[in-house]
Amino acid sequence: MEKIQKMISEKSVVIFSNNSCCMSHTIKTLFLDLGVNPTIYELDEINRGKEIEYALAQLGCSPTVPVVFIGGQLVGGANQVMSLHLNRSLIPMLKRFGALWL
């Protein structure tokens, strides 16, 4: 948990992802298309990726990828992010935490 806390405190938007996950790809594309430059951790490529995935599960993230943190706060997975986007809450949230300026 401590490692995750350190990782999410480094940037406004952090995405925990997996290269082989289509929903991870969708969420990364959404943020990039919005003009956000998220920090992306590919759990299938980094050291201790399985440990981090286990810690995300302990936080209640299911499935464990993709998982998005904005402003150091857990937003959730693809369903939660897409819901925020569709109800027009995502962009104001990104602006509030300095991840988006326009």
Swiss-Prot record:
A motif (Responsive for interaction with TGA factors) lies at residues 99-102. Its main location: cytoplasm. [2Fe-2S] cluster binds at residue 21. InterPro entries: GlrX-like_pln_2, Glutaredoxin, Glutaredoxin_subgr, Thioredoxin-like_sf. Keywords: 2Fe-2S, Cytoplasm, Iron, Iron-sulfur, Metal-binding, Nucleus, Redox-active center. GO terms for cellular component: cytosol; nucleus. CDD domains: GRX_GRXh_1_2_like. Gene3D superfamilies: Glutaredoxin. NCBIfam families: GlrX-like_plant (TIGR02189). Belongs to the glutaredoxin family. CC-type subfamily. This is Monothiol glutaredoxin-S8. It comes from Arabidopsis thaliana (Mouse-ear cress). The gene is GRXS8.
